[in-house]
Amino acid sequence: MRKLTLTLSALALALSLNSVADAKVYMPEKVSDGVTVAQLAEQHAIHWISVEQIEESLKGQPMAVGFDIDDTVLFSSPGFYRGKLEYSPNDYSYLKNPEFWEKMNNEWDKFSMPKKSGMELVQMHLKRGDTVYFITGRSKTKTETVTKYVQEGLRIPADKMNPVIFAGDEEGQNNKVSWMRDHKLKIYYGDADADIAAARELNIRGIRVLRASNSSYQPLPKAGQFGEEVVINSEY
């Protein structure tokens, strides 16, 4: 009798386990294929280009190329957001405050996140043997750790890392142009309209990198509006 009871108990346990295994989490019926965030970014008919396609187009001798930093290779909004709250919550005057730039250029980039697309672009150019320069519109400060964080975040070998160039931002002029000319750049990557305009002024190849939608730098620019190439999936 005891053996029969144990057998029946084991059978009941097995059946209960099978029913658990067969149970499925409820999912609604699919009514369309859906879309990812990356696919949404590609829906407009602009000149999309991938990192691989850029590399394929660059057959030949190494060259000098340049990158903007904020929203191009680094998602640095946390530092800028903190600066706005601390120095000018109601406007953007903090961007003219030397105290903010001392903080941003020396401490707050530790909260910046390297963009995957930025890393892929930089590594592609380094593999080609290109010389890479970083030209930012940030104001210059006596000391800076931006170079350190860019090098570490984008995994650039020390002997390939050039010090970050602080072009500054003056109303009515594009300070990046002279630096781009002096370093004989052939390509410049940036998220802002001014980056593409600077490249066009020098008749070099300006390639747009998408600014993340949650960037502190608003409003978002209209990528591709000048007919420039736009890097696919470069918002992150």
UniProtKB/Swiss-Prot annotation:
Species this protein is from: Morganella morganii
Catalytic machinery residues: D68 (nucleophile), D70 (proton donor)
InterPro entries assigned to the protein according to its UniProt record, in alphabetical order: Acid_phosphat_B-like, HAD-like_sf, HAD-SF_ppase_IIIB_AphA, HAD_sf
Gene assigned in the entry: aphA
Protein name: Class B acid phosphatase
Source taxonomy: Bacteria, Pseudomonadati, Pseudomonadota, Gammaproteobacteria, Enterobacterales
GO molecular function term, any single one: metal ion binding
Signal sequence coordinates: 1-23
Chain residues that bind substrate: T136, G137, K176
Gene Ontology CC annotation, any one: outer membrane-bounded periplasmic space
Cofactor dependence: Mg(2+)
Reactions listed under catalytic activity: a phosphate monoester + H2O = an alcohol + phosphate
Assembly description: Homotetramer.
Summary of pH dependence: Optimum pH is about 6 using pNPP as substrate. Retains more than 50% of maximal activity in the pH range 4-7.
Role according to the record: Dephosphorylates several organic phosphate monoesters including 5'-AMP, 3'-AMP, pNPP, PDP, 5'-UMP, 3'-UMP, G2P, glucose 6-P and ribose 5-P. No activity toward organic phosphate diesters. Also has a phosphotransferase activity catalyzing the transfer of low-energy phosphate groups from organic phosphate monoesters to free hydroxyl groups of various organic compounds.
Record's subcellular location: Periplasm
EC number, as in UniProt: 3.1.3.2
Keywords for this protein: Hydrolase, Magnesium, Metal-binding, Periplasm, Signal
